[in-house]
Amino acid sequence: MPEVWKIDFYIGDDGSLPVRAWLDTVPQDVRGKVLARIELLRTGGPTLDYPYTSQIEGKLREARLRVGKTRYRVLYFFDEDRTAILLHGFTKATAAVEESDKKIGRARMASHESRLAARTGQKTAPRTPAKENKRR
């Protein structure tokens, strides 16, 4: 039986669910396609690769979907509980992921890891400089 991974939405300090809120703004016919792409993480886990997902930097990855000329992305990472945490959803306007989107993803990932460490009593893992994690 293949391993099944968990998927969860990042929860903001104020209790918000930013990816769920973003999904509410996506056209209804596309929303199901975005959710289907995210569902692939359940069975593919961290080994699910291009064209479905790609690495942004370090543990930060993007779930990828193109509908017509529009590119939809959801930034996520797998936490220590073996759960894909959906961090940030956006419509991609350029070939590369904008630094502002990466910054949001990194901040939410750090927030989630900090809360997870506080809950489990563990220290968070030291960060590897982003430039060392870029694709070769």
Region locations from a protein language model:
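Basic, Lys/Arg-enriched alpha-helical interface segments
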Residues: 1-71, 80-84, 91-136
